[in-house]
C-alpha cells in the first residue's frame, strides 16, 4: 500500500483523514478507505508520543482555538519528510491527532477544520510526490561521483534506524 499514491486525489485524502478521526469499529472500516483505519489505529497506539510532541500547554492549541492555522501549518509542513511509508503514515496520523484534539471552544467550525488541515497538507504531499518523481526520472549520470547527501548529513548509524515503521525505536 502506497499512502502517497492513494492520497493523490484531494477528496480521497480528505475522506481518509476524516475517517481516521472516528473511533475504531465497523463504521470506520465499512464507510472509509482501509487507509483511514490504519491511520486511526496508529493515532490510538501512538497518542502518547503525539502528546509529547505537542503537549496540551503548547502554543499550537491556543492558535487553533483562535482560528490561526497558517503559521502553525507552515512550520509543520516545511520540515516534512515523506521518503518512506512509515513517515507518510506518521504524518497522516499526526494530522488526525490534531483534528481529534482540536479545542472544542475554537472559533473554527468542525466542518472548516478538516479543510484547514487537509488543504495545505495535501498540497505539500503533492509537491513532495512531484519532486520525488522528477528525481527518479533524472538519468543516473547526474548522480555519478556524488555521495549521498543523506549519508553525509546523518551518518550510517541513523540510516540503519530508518524504517517503514512510523515510530521505530
UniProtKB/Swiss-Prot annotation:
Statement: the UniProt record of this protein carries the keyword Membrane: no
Protein's recorded name: E1B protein, small T-antigen
Keywords recorded for this protein, A-Z: Early protein, Host-virus interaction, Inhibition of host apoptosis by viral BCL2-like protein, Modulation of host cell apoptosis by virus
Key word Transcription present: no
GO biological process: symbiont-mediated suppression of host apoptosis
Family designation: Belongs to the adenoviridae E1B 19 kDa protein family.
Coiled coil spans: none
Amino acid at each position: 500500500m502506497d499512502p502517497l499514491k492513494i492520497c493523490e486525489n484531494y477528496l480521497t485524502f480528505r475522506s481518509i483523514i476524516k475517517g481516521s478521526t472516528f473511533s475504531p469499529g465497523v463504521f470506520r472500516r465499512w464507510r472509509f478507505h482501509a487507509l483511514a483505519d490504519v491511520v486511526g489505529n496508529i493515532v490510538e497506539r501512538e497518542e502518547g508520543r503525539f502528546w509529547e510532541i505537542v503537549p496540551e500547554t503548547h502554543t499550537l492549541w491556543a492558535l487553533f482555538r483562535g482560528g490561526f492555522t497558517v503559521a502553525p501549518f507552515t512550520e509543520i509542513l516545511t520540515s516534512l519528510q515523506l521518503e518512506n511509508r512509515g513517515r507518510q503514515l506518521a504524518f497522516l496520523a499526526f494530522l488526525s491527532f490534531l483534528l481529534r484534539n482540536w479545542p472544542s471552544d475554537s472559533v473554527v467550525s468542525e466542518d472548516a477544520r478538516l479543510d484547514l488541515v487537509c488543504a495545505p497538507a495535501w498540497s505539500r504531499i503533492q509537491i513532495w510526490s512531484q519532486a520525488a518523481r522528477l528525481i527518479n526520472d533524472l538519468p543516473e549520470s547526474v548522480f555519478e561521483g556524488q555521495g549521498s547527501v543523506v549519508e553525509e548529513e546523518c551518518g550510517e548509524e541513523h540510516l540503519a534506524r530508518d524504517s517503514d515503521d512510523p515510530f521505530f525505536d
